[in-house]
From Swiss-Prot:
This is Pancreatic progenitor cell differentiation and proliferation factor A. Belongs to the PPDPF family. Pfam families: PPDFL (PF15060). It comes from Xenopus laevis (African clawed frog). Coiled coil: none annotated.
Length: 113
């Protein structure tokens, strides 16, 4: 069975991006044993972040919207859903939500026998 590499390989990749080569010579090889890199200083104008997750804010920025939307299935129709907090969940268009609201208001205003 193949062994799963430890996190050392990830650290090596990370160190590659945090260091720059001390030599600009084109004759140096990438696999050189005598690699001497220097740590690139942090720019004072940039915010410091966890180096393992600096990219997360680009994809998972802080949202002002709630993460979860409460959606309940209508007991009358097994295919219709009601949104309780006004947010549209993925896969539903604003048009379909408005149609649902119109049909709900019509069913609520109809006289009962």
């Amino acid at each position: 069975m193949a062994a799963i590499p430890s996190s050392g390989s990830l650290v090596a990749t990370h160190d590659y991006y945090r260091r720059r080569l001390g030599s600009t010579s084109s004759s140096s090889s990438c696999g050189s044993v005598d690699y001497s890199g220097e740590v690139i200083p942090h720019h004072p104008g940039l915010p410091k972040a966890d180096p393992g997750h600096w990219w997360a804010s680009f994809f998972f920025g802080k949202s002002t919207h709630p993460v979860m939307t409460t959606v309940s299935e209508s007991p009358e129709n097994s295919g219709s859903f009601r949104i309780t907090n006004g947010l549209v969940p993925c896969g539903l268009t604003q048009e379909s939500v408005q149609k649902q609201k119109v049909s709900d208001s019509k069913s609520n205003s109809s006289p009962s026998a």
